[in-house]
Amino acid sequence: MVLTQKETAALKDLQTQEQSCIEKYTRYSQEAKDPQLKDLFKHISTDEQKHYKSLGQALNGTVPSVDCNDTQGRNYQPKAHYTPNDNSPEKKTDCFLVTDCIGTEKLVSGEYNSDVFVFGDSDIRKLL
């Protein structure tokens, strides 16, 4: 598969976003106080590494197959670590990390939503 210059640039930009997410979520897994949140950030970082790798494969001309019906989060039911009235520094730290994570994911998903229209190949669009 031969990519256009615009497609190549879009994939490289997305890889940059994924690399930033990997670094952020790895750091957040170390900073989080709640053990389940630590594990969640580790899991998200691993998923971002997979995204980064699949974008690299696409840049090299091979589009990996993907499951467009990803349901792994469907059964995620973490137990509450903090109480509603808890105003501890640990809770505030974890709240900041989660809020920033959500904002980051919204930003990056917006990039994917825009960049999907750059590609003519339906397999790459599925990947994104």
Regions found by a protein language model. Give the residues of each.
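Acidic/histidine-rich alpha-helical segments that form the ligand environment
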Residues: E7-E31, P78-L127
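Secondary-structure boundary/capping motif
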Residues: C21, D47-H51, L128
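N-terminal leader/targeting segments and the first structural element of proteins
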Residues: M1-Q5
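Conserved alpha-helical segments that form or flank metal/cofactor-binding pockets of metalloenzymes
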Residues: P35-Y76
